[in-house]
Amino acid sequence: MDNIKRVILKLSGEALAKKEGGYNDELIENIANQVKTIVDKGTDVGVVIGGGNYWRGRSNDNIDRTKADQIGMLATIMNCIYVSEIFRSQGLKTNILTPFECGSMTKLFSKDRANKYFEKGMVVFFAGGTGHPYFSTDTGIVLRAIELDADAILLAKAIDGVYDSDPKINPKAKKYDKISITDVVDKHLGVIDMTASV
């Protein structure tokens, strides 16, 4: 990580949840401590959190897709508020930016504002995805990484790697030890939103 000056971390909402519901505070504290080690070495860290622990709107045919995605955006904001508070409790300075106004809970995203927070040594949480329906938080993280000249994107999902099919559905799914983003796209592996991967 010595040559990486800025990284954007994507955390799956599902990965942060306990099986019985709620948040896995021990896991989040562990992540916070790992992030603190990186920040203390001078690396800027941005965080995007999915909303899957609250909402999987695409699985509900009774709700309009736009409305379902808006609910998902709100779920990411709730996750960022919670996780940023756990990060603060572990000695990190944080701030939350969203692509739309949220009153006093967050600040409106701008590249200048994010860079100002990074200069102050803050972990910057990017909530609300892109602010538009039909785009996942995977797309949101790529967008923020491009806008902010990030050196790397790290994905922490609710699964331990990339498989040739969904291991939750197919117990014989083959795990890849190494795979390029080109192969992920060509094989339609679904580990990341296709819009984000291209």
Where in the sequence are the language-model features?
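Alpha-helix C-terminal capping segments
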Residues: 39-41, 81-91, 143-151
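Active-site phosphate/oxyanion-binding loops
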Residues: 58-66, 101-123, 133-198
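Short beta-strand segments
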Residues: 8-12, 49-50, 97, 126-128, ...
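Glycine/small-residue-rich loop that forms an oxyanion/phosphate-binding "nest" at active or ligand-binding sites
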Residues: 60-106
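Hydrophobic anchor at the start of a short beta-strand
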Residues: 45, 93-94, 153
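N-terminal glycine-/serine-/threonine-rich phosphate-binding loop
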Residues: 1-44
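Short glycine-rich anion-binding loops that position phosphate/pyrophosphate groups of nucleotides
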Residues: 13-15, 52-54, 129-132, 159
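Loop/turn-to-beta-strand initiation segments
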Residues: 42-46, 121-123
